[in-house]
Amino acid sequence: IVSQINGVANEYKVNFYTSQLTKDGKQSKLYDSYSKLPEMVGRKVEIDGEIRENRYYSTNLNQLISTQLLAGKFVKGVVETAIDTATFVVGGFLVKTPVERRNKKDEVYRYDVTLGQSNYAGNGMSMITLHINPDHAEIVRAVEGMYGVGDTIQFTGSLVFKTEVVTVE
């Protein structure tokens, strides 16, 4: 998905997945909807979805790898004059207090806030890490002042989804 928000070009990779058949063996309405996605290329759309964790074990690195992705659920066409926006609402329990990230010049370039989410069965958990721009450090101070580890919290904000590769030297 490509959009212009506040004069800045943004590109979002959104994954769509569903089974072709329901548990009852009937054709899935979501599958029917997703099969029409190629017809929407080049058109303005509205997507509802979720930020999801993808966790897997890397035998090459001999460690657990966690990535976040945007998972689309519902998509519909909108008028071409609609203003581009990208917002999110995400909630969960605070896994750890906000972490300050610094670059090689020892400048703060972001704060990380990690939320945990349990599945409905209660036998699995996902972790979502939100990055807060240092220009909005008041958000971090509010989290530190009002919430403790394990408390339920909800964030609403503007979505900037970047792929980042971290190399440990």
Summary of predicted features, one role per range:
Residues 1-169:
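OB-fold and OB-like single-stranded nucleic-acid-recognition modules
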